[in-house]
Each structure stands twice: as structure tokens, then as C-alpha cells.
């Protein structure tokens, strides 16, 4: 099997999908639409991670809530990966408040050191991300729907 020396942590809103039986996998029932619940999970976890993959609900608010909370749980030099980063552009129900600031726009603002406001990320969290994201890059997906690539992935590297 892959990564035989690794430990895996999985968080899911659907308790019926939490069905892995392995000493290497710890599972948590979590509502990622609740910033408080995600903060509680981050505080509960006494681990820091080499890789964190956000392949959760694809709701824009959930992606933006999770990023600053769980990016802090990365080891130095670790990677935070967000899958299907633009699905909310096609599926409007994934952005019910019609938030204009997308994860890609946030990364570009951070890179250019431009000030911005977010309904989901506090100013303190923005400053933390500015100081701690070393680099990011995109991997183009192949799933196109209504002229939008909905399967792009972004990789964020934490400072060493």
C-alpha cells in the first residue's frame, strides 16, 4: 500500500462515510461549514502535518474558512492542497452569498501584498497567510463544464 509509514486523518460531514478500519487512519465527524467546529478540531489535533488536502464540500465559504485554520497545522515546508478550486463558478449553490473574492484572487492579492477584505477570513488570518505561504502553483484538471475547468488543484507551500 501507499505511504506505509504515514498516518492519515480524515474529516467528513457524513458519518456513514467514516468506515475505514486501520490503525493508521483516524476519522472525525466534522461540519466544515462551522468555523467554530473546525477551530475545535484543529485545537484537538496535537499533530502537525506534511500534507493537508481540502477535498471537502466545495462550498466557497467552507474552503475559505478551512484555509487559515488548517494551514496553521502544517509543518514547515508542508503542502496545503485544495482540489476542485473553481466548482462554485459553475454550481451557484456552492456560493450562495455570491462572494466575489475567490481563493485564486486571495492568493494573487497575498502574492502582491495587496490589502483586501473577506467575509470569511479575518484580517489576522490574512496576515498569517501572507507571512506563511511561501509559494503556490496550479495543476490544471481535465473536467470542463460550461466553459469552466472545475477540477483545477492549487498547491500551497508553507515557509520553512
Region roles according to the model:
Residues 1-160:
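S-adenosylmethionine/decaboxylated-SAM
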Amino acid at each position: 500500500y501507499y505511504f506505509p509509514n504515514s498516518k492519515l486523518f480524515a474529516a467528513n460531514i457524513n458519518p456513514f462515510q467514516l468506515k475505514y478500519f486501520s490503525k493508521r487512519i483516524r476519522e472525525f465527524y466534522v461540519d466544515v461549514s462551522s468555523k467554530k467546529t473546525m477551530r475545535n478540531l484543529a485545537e484537538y489535533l496535537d499533530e502537525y502535518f506534511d500534507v493537508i488536502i481540502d477535498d471537502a464540500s466545495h462550498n466557497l465559504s467552507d474552503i475559505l474558512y478551512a484555509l487559515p485554520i488548517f494551514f496553521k497545522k502544517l509543518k514547515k515546508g508542508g503542502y496545503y492542497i485544495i482540489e476542485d478550486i473553481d466548482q462554485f463558478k459553475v454550481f451557484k449553490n456552492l456560493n450562495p452569498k455570491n462572494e466575489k473574492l475567490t481563493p485564486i484572487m486571495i492568493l494573487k492579492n497575498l502574492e502582491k501584498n495587496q490589502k483586501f477584505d473577506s467575509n470569511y477570513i479575518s484580517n489576522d488570518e490574512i496576515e498569517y497567510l501572507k507571512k506563511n505561504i511561501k509559494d503556490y502553483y496550479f495543476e490544471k484538471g481535465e473536467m470542463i463544464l460550461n466553459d469552466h475547468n472545475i477540477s483545477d488543484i492549487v498547491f500551497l507551500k508553507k515557509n520553512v
